[in-house]
Amino acid sequence: MIETNTFGATTIAQDDYKMPELAREMNLAAAKLAKQACDEFSTPDKPRFVAGAVGPTPKTASISPDVNDPAVRNVTFEQLRQAYKEQVEALYEGGADVFLVETIFDTLNAKAALFAIQNVCKEKNIKMP
């Protein structure tokens, strides 16, 4: 299993660097590179697979960024779902065989990532483990 280097490659995460428009390209390129490596070293006895990494964002849907106002949120579930959906689509297009949702400490963010994966799989009729 080769994991893509896309841990922080969502539009939300890349917005901190003023590069949200590059998120799709990052995911697509990372998946293609991982797929090339898998293809190069796969054998019938030892197949290799691409795990598209889907990681946390710097914004959380469950935790307030303002200790003085615990009701404040700096991102919505829908914004997270859409950002993860864009990431998952590009990872799949680039050759990801599975998606690895990792180290997302906010369970609502993780739920958005899982919903995005479900949405993409349903829309594209993808069957994945």
Can you annotate each of these PLM segments?
Residues 1-129:
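Domain-level signal for soluble alpha/beta catalytic cores
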